[in-house]
């Protein structure tokens, strides 16, 4: 297991690589290049510069999150083949610089959705939350909230240039139901996985967040059955999963422990986001993102890590999101301090599992 933290790049992240390098047990960075629009090829010189900058700080770059998928692919438009070819070229370019895993999602319009990016806890820390009654009927209101909250840093999946086209996107997706989205997903996977096999990269899809339909948009990565379908539609180790414990557990019907155990055992989880959530009494699916320690949330983090350890997990992990604590401000979910605490906690659980199984 190799602990990592997400980093958005020196021009898009207030957290410094030197600070990440000081977090005990964190060996690598999950990198991205935020200003390359979906559908365009990632140039080799940009990848090389990113890798060299990270390695100069004493960290590794083995995982990229995310190489966004153009909506024409998800919708199934005739232009999709052009964007798929571009995606293949990006895969080849990333592999040339030692990238092993690409985390991505296949969600229409919104890459993730929360009702509150500044939810106050009793200790006055701030976190992200989802309360169904607070989700407006008009998706533009959600966009306005996000853009007001992101300060000087855009949020991943909510890039301004994409959100400016949101009305047109909803119109474009109006005839895309779950069956059609699944067909388009299969088309994409069948096209790119042979390239991944050639160059040694694993495509690891992130579960839908939340894992159920919103605004009438379909979801196809929402439960164990969907993950099984994905693995079987192209049966290859290169066709993999980023198991996000927070996202998959947002639907209480999903048994995150069994899902983790099964797909680690099947060698389909090269990358994991491990975070805790706390369900609220206001509704069955209402929650906030809790501190990582088990007792503060609704998930048993030891049980999650044990499911990974017992079934031979040998991939990359990151603590995913954190609260804003100790007066820190910045991109919601991506401050330094609470993620550092989460990484240390998860590393401690892993060390305990290793030593009790010697």
Swiss-Prot record:
Cofactor: Fe(2+); Mn(2+)
Superkingdom of origin: Bacteria
UniProt EC number: 4.2.1.8
GO molecular function: ferrous iron binding; manganese ion binding; mannonate dehydratase activity
Enzyme class: lyase
Catalysis: reaction(s): D-mannonate = 2-dehydro-3-deoxy-D-gluconate + H2O
Sorted UniProt keywords: Iron, Lyase, Manganese
UniProt GO BP: D-glucuronate catabolic process
Pathway(s) served: Carbohydrate metabolism; pentose and glucuronate interconversion
Function according to Swiss-Prot or TrEMBL: Catalyzes the dehydration of D-mannonate.
UniProt similarity note: Belongs to the mannonate dehydratase family.
Protein name: Mannonate dehydratase
Annotated source species: Lactococcus lactis subsp. lactis (strain IL1403)
Origin organism lineage: Bacteria, Bacillati, Bacillota, Bacilli, Lactobacillales
Primary gene name: uxuA
């Amino acid at each position: 297991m190799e602990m990592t933290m997400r980093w958005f790049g020196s021009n898009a992240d207030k957290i410094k690589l030197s600070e990440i390098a000081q977090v005990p047990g964190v060996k690598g960075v999950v990198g991205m290049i935020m200003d390359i629009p979906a559908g365009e090829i990632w140039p080799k010189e940009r990848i090389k510069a990113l890798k060299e900058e990270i390695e100069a700080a004493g960290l590794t770059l083995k995982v990229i999150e995310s190489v966004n998928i153009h909506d024409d692919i998800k919708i199934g438009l005739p232009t999709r083949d052009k964007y798929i070819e571009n995606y293949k070229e990006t895969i080849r370019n990333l592999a040339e610089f030692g990238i092993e895993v690409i985390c991505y999602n296949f969600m229409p319009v919104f890459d993730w959705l929360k009702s509150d990016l500044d939810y106050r806890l009793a200790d006055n820390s701030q976190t992200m939350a989802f309360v169904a009654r607070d989700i407006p009927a008009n998706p533009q209101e959600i966009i306005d909230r996000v853009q007001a909250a992101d300060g000087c840093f855009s949020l991943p999946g909510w890039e301004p240039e994409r959100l400016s086209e949101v009305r047109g996107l909803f119109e474009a997706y109006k005839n895309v139901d779950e069956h059609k989205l699944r067909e388009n997903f299969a088309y994409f996977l069948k096209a790119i996985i042979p390239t991944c096999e050639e160059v040694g990269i694993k495509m690891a899809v992130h579960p839908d967040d939340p894992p159920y339909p919103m605004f009438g948009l379909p979801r196809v990565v929402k439960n164990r059955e969907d993950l099984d379908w994905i693995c079987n539609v192209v049966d290859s180790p290169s066709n993999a999963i980023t198991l996000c414990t927070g996202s998959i557990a947002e639907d209480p019907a999903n048994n995150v422990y069994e899902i983790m155990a099964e797909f680690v055992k099947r060698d389909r989880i090269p990358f994991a986001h491990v975070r805790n959530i706390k369900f609220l009494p206001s509704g069955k699916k209402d929650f906030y993102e809790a501190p990582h320690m088990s007792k503060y949330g609704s998930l048993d983090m030891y049980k999650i890590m044990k499911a990974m350890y017992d079934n031979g997990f040998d991939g990359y992990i990151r603590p995913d999101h954190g609260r804003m604590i100790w007066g820190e401000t910045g991109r919601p979910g991506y401050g330094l301090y609470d993620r550092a605490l989460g990484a240390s906690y998860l590393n401690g659980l892993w060390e305990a599992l290793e030593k009790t199984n010697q």
